[in-house]
């Protein structure tokens, strides 16, 4: 708490006040500040002090009325005691009346982001005038505000404070650090002093008529003039001289803690005297640790020194250019300087309401521009020439608007703005606004399109297959679009075809490009397929990342009334592409933010998701309106591709406007094919091995590929696989650099050298049997994970208690494993269903004793990996089988897994993510998979990507060829289940072969 308190545990309370009326002031310890306030904004603060009896007789408050104090009492006895303790340590500077309690207050800078650090200051003088009160504060210590309040404006509040005691921290430093800090401060101070002296000397020489010609450029620099005004004022000279004298006294003393503390205190004085930026002073004030403050001080002063270095470099550069320039170039340079001065004087004249000052400004303007007739003429000629060129360019653009097919509203608006622009002078406030507007509008490529060459479907297919493996659904949709364009091309070029049925405008509407939404897990090729499509179509490609967009103006643009307004991302993409028919990829469309908590963002910034509704609607985007452009722009020729990882983040209206194409994760075989055909050659080229001709070809064996795909990566995409392949190739590069020789083959045993050890085999660990556990009650379900992959989800059920009272209203099931509400409901449904079928005697071989034991027992159901949240209805069949397994005490094969929602009647309903779940079953080495019968079409689509083949498989129900194809690909034997008894039949085939009794058991 500081060394001066009565006891280490005593609390300090001081009133806190934010310097709203002095927003650029940063109070630093050791410095006195004289601040003028408007009477209404500060009078209540002083009245609050006078209301307390301890300050009532303070002579500084003689003219203050207590009736204007705040309703809440801020200055109480705790504040009085704290003021006394502060004055005990810091009030030894000739106080006029030691009997008076001095007023201390914590001053907080207005511009600070964090108002928890301020300066404890003593009020030393108060001057009251009519509408103004001027207060002198003497800042004495840096303190931490323990109870910061925001938006207090001119209000005063009491807070518990903590002195930031530099002396205590200094005691923890060793002698070496003390000595180093002293030497560092002394060097920085004297280096700065020398730089300031040299600058003043150069400037004084440049300001004299008899001075060096080369030094006169320094006198032209606005930076040099500003620095000289700041560093040559009487206040700066006096303060700097005192600091220098005090430093000379300290340097002769012994280098100990006390000397170092005095130098540390001088840092605050130096930061307040030198012309530092507001941010630098704020950072310096709020730095609590002395060591970090010392580093910040060194950085700030060195930055200040660099200003003079850059100033000297700029002067040397101008002198070198000036010495090699012709007289005409020199005249132009001086003319530009004079013209800038004239503009500045004109601004002063406009802002000055005094007639006398206006006349003086006019006289100064005449004197400045009249000495050299040539300079004046040259300046005017250059200005007029530039202005004429601008006008000609804009006029040419305005005249060609109809040819460029600009919307009629746009033609009217641009012509009107151009007329206003022609009447303005460059000094007009709106001149530059309109100039920037015309620059942006002229960049929009109205009427410019990239002509698509003759469409060859075979070459297009080959190009897509060359760039991407799989993704048949995207390729199929693109081929359909190319075929439509091909028909249009044929109908246009063949005079024998009847084009009256489809006039030109109708054909244009038929050829509207599709708006495709590619949904899939990360790394499956959504973004890269869009680039390939642009290459196939011969269109310019532009990518817009929508992640984190939270403002409608970023899509639609800012209105021109705002300072620094710009067009939106869509118009910006057209400007970059230089054509009206590019392919624009809206990446991560599901990450668009749609407002803050409680819809606040929608009210303030607009909804960027809603702004996309017009962009992605083929019926509306022909008249897309950007706020900055101000008139409709035709986007109907743009081919929009959108990507997303999850449909949940996309609103229904937006989703309805796009064609949805789902990209599932890759199978291990597909990953191996992509890795060998695409990724490995790409990494070899990226790491430079392709340039070395004598090297053997690098390849991975089949075992190595399987190991990399199955053990070193766990993802639906191939980004992680590419990183692993890159690590292998870089390892080969290291071997070549060290040995000048490498082996081309990479087998499974060599992988550890490049990739380290494989991931922990969690699949084997979870599914492995335990020594003392029961074999029954364990069933493998299937899950679709949030990253787009599938996996086996284990359900464990054990009996933990039996009710000896014989109550048969159970069983009671406790659940763990971070389960969601829907999964909890599935457990309740499964429990009721198993009770129902046992009660009706639908399972043969179950006696009354087993039923009673089941109904009177308590069970515990757990799903491993509790850190992962789990939810959804698709585990109903697996949970029912696990509970039935416990009731019958029959184990389930650990190589069997299943998925499907169950109803109270035992019906197995269809679920989603079939392909991903089958991949997960393959990854976990399952043999048999049970899926709902209604998922037949999903299974067919998982084993085949060709439409014709899918139809043939789907219609052949007698042979069910999809089962054999799946087994050939994944070694999985799939069974369809219509109801729960199909599940029981495939799980325990021998059980249902017994005679089924339908009589109700007697309980």
UniProtKB/Swiss-Prot annotation:
Residues 367-389 are annotated as: Disordered. The active site is at 874, 917. Residues 368-377 have a biased composition (Polar residues). GO terms for molecular function: ATP binding; ATP hydrolysis activity; ATP-dependent peptidase activity; serine-type endopeptidase activity. InterPro entries: AAA+_ATPase, ATPase_AAA_core, Lon_lid, Lon_proteolytic, Lon_Prtase, Lon_prtase_N, Lonp2_euk, P-loop_NTPase. One of its GO terms (biological process) is protein import into peroxisome matrix. GO terms for cellular component: peroxisomal matrix. It is found in: Peroxisome matrix. ATP binds at residues 520-527. CDD domains: RecA-like_Lon (cd19500). It catalyses: Hydrolysis of proteins in presence of ATP. SUPFAM superfamilies: P-loop containing nucleoside triphosphate hydrolases (SSF52540), Ribosomal protein S5 domain 2-like (SSF54211). Residues 773-969 form the Lon proteolytic domain. Its EC number is 3.4.21.53. Keywords: ATP-binding, Hydrolase, Nucleotide-binding, Peroxisome, Protease, Serine protease. Residues 14-305 form the Lon N-terminal domain. Belongs to the peptidase S16 family. HAMAP family: lonp2_euk. ATP-dependent serine protease that mediates the selective degradation of misfolded and unassembled polypeptides in the peroxisomal matrix. Necessary for type 2 peroxisome targeting signal (PTS2)-containing protein processing and facilitates peroxisome matrix protein import. This is Lon protease homolog 2, peroxisomal.
């Amino acid at each position: 708490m500081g060394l001066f308190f009565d006891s280490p545990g005593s609390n300090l309370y001081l009133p806190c006040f934010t310097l709203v009326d002095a927003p650029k002031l940063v109070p630093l310890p050791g410095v006195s500040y004289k601040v003028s306030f408007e009477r209404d904004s500060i009078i209540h603060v002083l009245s609050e002090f006078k209301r307390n009896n301890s300050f009532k007789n303070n002579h500084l408050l003689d003219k203050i009325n207590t009736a204007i104090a705040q309703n809440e009492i801020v200055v109480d006895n705790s504040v009085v005691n704290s003021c006394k303790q502060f004055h005990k340590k810091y009030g030894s500077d000739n106080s006029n009346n030691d009997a008076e309690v001095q007023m201390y207050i914590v001053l907080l800078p207005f511009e600070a982001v964090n108002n928890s650090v301020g300066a404890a200051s003593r009020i030393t003088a108060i001057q009251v005038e009519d509408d103004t009160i001027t207060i002198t504060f003497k800042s004495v210590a840096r303190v931490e505000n323990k109870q910061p309040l925001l938006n207090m404006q001119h209000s005063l509040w009491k807070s518990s404070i903590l002195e930031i005691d530099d002396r205590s921290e200094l005691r923890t430093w060793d002698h070496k650090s003390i000595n180093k800090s002293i030497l560092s401060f002394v060097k920085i101070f004297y280096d700065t002093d020398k730089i300031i002296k040299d600058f003043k000397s150069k400037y004084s020489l440049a300001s004299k008529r008899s001075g060096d010609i080369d030094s006169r450029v320094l006198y032209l620099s606005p930076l040099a003039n500003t620095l000289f005004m700041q560093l040559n004022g009487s206040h700066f000279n006096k303060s700097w001289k005192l600091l220098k004298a005090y430093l000379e006294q300290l340097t002769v003393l012994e280098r100990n803690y006390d000397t170092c503390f005095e130098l540390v205190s001088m840092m605050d004085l130096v930061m307040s005297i030198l012309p530092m930026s507001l941010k630098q002073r704020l950072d310096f004030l709020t730095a609590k640790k002395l060591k970090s403050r010392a580093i910040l001080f060194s950085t700030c002063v060195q930055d200040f020194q660099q200003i003079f270095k850059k100033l000297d470099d700029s002067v040397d550069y101008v002198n070198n250019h000036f010495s090699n320039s012709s007289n005409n170039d020199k005249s132009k340079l001086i003319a530009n300087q004079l013209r800038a001065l004239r503009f500045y004087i004109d601004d002063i004249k406009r802002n000055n309401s005094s007639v006398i000052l206006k006349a003086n400004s006019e006289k100064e303007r005449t004197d400045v521009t009249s000495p050299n007739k040539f300079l004046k003429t040259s300046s005017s000629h250059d200005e007029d020439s530039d202005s004429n060129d601008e006008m000609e360019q804009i006029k040419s653009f305005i005249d060609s608007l109809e040819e460029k097919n600009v919307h009629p509203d746009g033609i009217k608006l641009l012509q009107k703005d151009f007329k206003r622009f022609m009447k303005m002078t460059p000094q007009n406030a709106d001149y530059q606004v309109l100039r920037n507007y015309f620059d942006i509008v002229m960049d929009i490529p109205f009427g410019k399109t990239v002509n698509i060459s003759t469409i060859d479907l075979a070459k297009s297919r080959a190009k897509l297959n060359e760039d991407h493996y799989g993704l048949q659904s995207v390729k199929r949709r693109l081929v359909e679009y190319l075929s439509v364009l091909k028909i249009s091309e044929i109908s246009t070029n063949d005079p024998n075809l009847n084009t009256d049925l489809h006039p030109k405008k109708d054909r244009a509407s038929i050829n509207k490009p599709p708006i495709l939404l590619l949904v899939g897990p990360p790394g499956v090729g959504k973004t890269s397929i869009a680039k390939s499509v642009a290459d196939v179509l011969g269109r310019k490609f532009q990518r817009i990342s929508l992640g984190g967009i939270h403002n409608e103006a970023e899509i639609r643009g800012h209105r021109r009334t705002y300072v620094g307004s710009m067009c939106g991302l869509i118009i910006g993409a057209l400007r970059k592409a230089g054509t009206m028919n590019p392919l624009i990829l809206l990446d991560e469309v599901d990450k668009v933010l749609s407002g803050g908590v409680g819809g606040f963002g929608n009210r303030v910034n607009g909804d960027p998701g809603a702004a996309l509704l017009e962009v992605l609607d083929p019926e509306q985007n022909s008249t897309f309106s950007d706020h900055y452009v101000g008139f409709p722009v035709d986007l109907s020729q743009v081919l929009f591709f959108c990507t997303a990882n999850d449909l949940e983040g996309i609103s229904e209206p937006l989703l309805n406007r796009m064609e949805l194409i789902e990209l599932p994760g890759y199978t291990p075989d597909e990953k191996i094919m992509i890795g060998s055909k695409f990724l490995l050659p790409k990494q070899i080229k990226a790491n430079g091995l392709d340039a070395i001709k004598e090297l053997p070809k690098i390849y991975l064996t089949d075992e190595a590929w399987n190991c990399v795909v199955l053990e070193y990566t766990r993802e639906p995409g191939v980004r992680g696989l590419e990183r692993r392949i890159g690590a292998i190739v870089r390892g080969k590069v290291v071997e070549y650099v060290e040995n000048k020789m490498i082996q081309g083959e990479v087998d499974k045993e060599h992988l550890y050298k490049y990739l380290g050890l494989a991931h922990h085999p969690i699949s084997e660990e979870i599914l492995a049997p335990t020594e003392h556990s029961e074999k029954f009650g364990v069933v493998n379900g299937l899950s679709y994970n949030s990253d787009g992959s599938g996996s086996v989800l284990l359900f464990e059920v054990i009996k933990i208690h039996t009710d000896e009272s014989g109550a048969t209203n159970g069983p009671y099931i406790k659940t763990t494993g971070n389960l969601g509400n829907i999964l909890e409901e599935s457990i309740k449904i499964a429990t009721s269903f198993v009770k129902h079928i046992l009660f009706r005697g639908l399972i043969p071989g179950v006696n009354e004793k087993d039923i009673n034991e089941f109904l009177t027992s308590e069970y515990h159901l757990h799903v491993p990996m509790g850190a992962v949240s789990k939810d959804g209805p698709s585990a109903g069949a697996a949970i029912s089988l696990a509970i039935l397994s416990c009731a019958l005490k029959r184990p389930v094969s650990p190589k069997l897994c299943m998925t499907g929602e169950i109803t109270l009647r035992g019906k197995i309903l269809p679920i989603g993510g079939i392909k991903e779940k089958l991949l997960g079953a393959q990854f976990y080495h399952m043999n048999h998979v049970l899926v709902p019968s209604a998922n037949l079409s999903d299974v067919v689509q998982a084993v085949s990507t060709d439409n014709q083949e899918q139809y043939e498989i789907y219609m052949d129900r007698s042979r069910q060829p999809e089962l054999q194809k799946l087994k050939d690909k994944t070694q999985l034997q799939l069974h369809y289940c219509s109801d729960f008894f199909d599940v029981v039949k495939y799980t325990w085939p021998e059980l249902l072969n017994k005679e089924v009794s339908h009589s109700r058991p007697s309980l």
